[in-house]
């Protein structure tokens, strides 16, 4: 059985973990993302700005409000998991970026980095790049 290798970053009691998702079709590449609220405040996940740079040097930006258009709220101790996949024309790429998060009692929006994740279309495991 495949056990994914998660890479993790922690910023201000927000933990973001990511790993490559195994795809049966080599024409697709996928990833899993987990956002944990380890703070004492309720948080809102307002959006994401993800970049993908392939092994040919091409860059793609995906900027969205929320996740799938939904702005999420997480109470202390709660987490959210998200999976996504994309058709690809490369053998390897790096996924990186930020999530826009605000805490309930702090009227400030922060860009929290996601861990950089190397993705492969031939289903090799991920590598830590941070």
Task: Report each predicted region and the residues it spans.
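Terminal connector regions
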Residues: 2-4, 86-130
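Short, solvent-exposed loop/turn segments enriched in Ser/Thr/Gly
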Residues: 27-32, 96
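Intrinsically disordered, low-complexity Pro/Gly/Ser/Thr-rich segments with frequent PxxP/GP/PP motifs
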Residues: 60-92
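Low-complexity, acidic Ser/Thr/Pro/Gly-rich terminal tails and inter-domain linkers that flank the onset
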Residues: 1-27, 127
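Short acidic, flexible loop segments centered on an aromatic residue
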Residues: 42-60, 101
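Asparagine-centered strand-capping/turn motif at beta-strand->loop junctions
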Residues: 34-39
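Beta-rich interaction modules in large eukaryotic scaffold/regulatory proteins
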Residues: 52, 64, 73, 112-121
């Amino acid at each position: 059985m495949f056990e994914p290798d998660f890479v993790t970053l922690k910023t201000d009691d927000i933990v973001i973990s990511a790993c490559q998702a195994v795809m049966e079709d080599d024409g697709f590449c996928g990833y899993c993302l987990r956002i944990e609220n380890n703070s004492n405040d309720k948080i809102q996940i307002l959006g994401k700005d993800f970049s993908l740079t392939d092994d040919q040097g091409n860059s793609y930006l995906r900027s969205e409000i929320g996740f799938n258009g939904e702005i999420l709220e997480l109470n202390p101790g709660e987490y959210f998991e998200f999976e996504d996949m994309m058709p690809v024309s490369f053998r390897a790429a790096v996924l990186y970026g930020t999530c826009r998060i605000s805490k309930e009692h702090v009227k400030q929006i922060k860009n929290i980095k996601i861990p950089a994740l190397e993705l492969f279309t031939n289903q090799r495991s991920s590598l830590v790049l941070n």
